[in-house]
Amino acid sequence: MTDNSKIRVVVGMSGGVDSSVTALLLKEQGYDVIGVFMKNWDDTDEFGVCTATEDYKDVAAVADQIGIPYYSVNFEKEYWDRVFEYFLAEYRAGRTPNPDVMCNKEIKFKAFLDYAMTLGADYVATGHYAQVKRDENGTVYMLRGADNGKDQTYFLSQLSQEQLQKTLFPLGHLQKSEVREIAERAGLATAKKKDSTGICFIGEKNFKQFLSQYLPAQKGRMMTIDGRDMGEHAGLMYYTIGQRGGLGIGGQHGGDNQPWFVVGKDLSQNILYVGQGFYHEALMSNSLDASVIHFTREMPEEFTFECTAKFRYRQPDSQVTVHVREDKAEVVFAEPQRAITPGQAVVFYDGKECLGGGMIDMAYKNGQPCQYI
């Protein structure tokens, strides 16, 4: 049996059940485990309640239960500079960002990894549902989590080979239901705790209200593609391509009673374009351009390959051909795709392996840019 006692693993503990079980499993496997709570955002609400304080209490309770030391580290400045400023800049540009991808790249697997190294870590571990596999040459492959419904490789697609070399994902082979069972069997303080959802710095707050604190909303016209005025929009940043709710149109303006969707934006004119029908022609495209192209292991600077891709979390894979030039790529779809959204991540897969991905800049239909920003 391998002696893991000389291998130090620093676990990012959020106060949730996944990271609690991560720490427990590593401790049971004999590793030298340290728990670290990351405070990335000052989320004190109007009543003076800070959920981070509650979460840290849960981390402390679990760490005491399983018998590991624990610390708290403050990354609020790094998070603001590297994640939140990016989030705001993307909204200013009319795009729909994915802060989770950037948080993993810049905070959980950069700032936190650097901090863990100062604690003498050999590895860091998190409660993500993903797997790492090492070959005989030492190359690390990132694979989808065994639980298809929970797989989080989409959000980890910007991790580098160097980051993956130092990372363990102890939950990757488990189903979420098994993780809960392990927590309950061990009597962990977080066993019954509800999973957090949504963007961490928004939490339970109203998204529109939150965003308007940082970006002034500019109302404008809502139009159909053929120029019919459909009323007023509240500010382009509040709408995403393919969105159905929150338009305030209803079926009364259309002859066919189909629901209305956001089908485009014109940032220069401050116009929101809407159209009827889930598969409205303005929502369909057959290729995209992406930048910040990044692979989880070494690849040539220029090459073309076929694979499957996701254009948003929780969607089935689609067959694509990818033409890579340095850190940019053209991605051509085998079948037309709906609501390809600038600012979101496109992530490439070869079977179970997550190859990497990039950020969507523009969608195209028959070579013409879609009016999405």
Swiss-Prot record:
Disulfide bonds join C103-C200. Pfam families: tRNA_Me_trans (PF03054), tRNA_Me_trans_C (PF20258), tRNA_Me_trans_M (PF20259). It is an enzyme of class 2 (transferase). Residues 98-100 are annotated as: Interaction with target base in tRNA. GO terms for molecular function: ATP binding; tRNA binding; tRNA-uridine 2-sulfurtransferase activity. GO terms for cellular component: cytoplasm. ATP binds at G12, M13, S14, G15, G16, V17, D18, S19, M38, G127. The keyword tRNA-binding applies. The active site is at C103, C200. Keywords: ATP-binding, Cytoplasm, Disulfide bond, Nucleotide-binding, RNA-binding, Transferase, tRNA processing, tRNA-binding. Residues 150-152, 312-313 are annotated as: Interaction with tRNA. It catalyses: S-sulfanyl-L-cysteinyl-[protein] + uridine(34) in tRNA + AH2 + ATP = 2-thiouridine(34) in tRNA + L-cysteinyl-[protein] + A + AMP + diphosphate + H(+). It is found in: Cytoplasm. GO terms for biological process: tRNA wobble position uridine thiolation. Its EC number is 2.8.1.13. The record marks H128, Q344 as: Interaction with tRNA. Its main location: cytoplasm. It comes from the Bacteria. NCBIfam families: PRK00143.1, trmU. Belongs to the MnmA/TRMU family. Catalyzes the 2-thiolation of uridine at the wobble position (U34) of tRNA, leading to the formation of s(2)U34. This is tRNA-specific 2-thiouridylase MnmA. It comes from Streptococcus pyogenes serotype M2 (strain MGAS10270). The gene is mnmA.
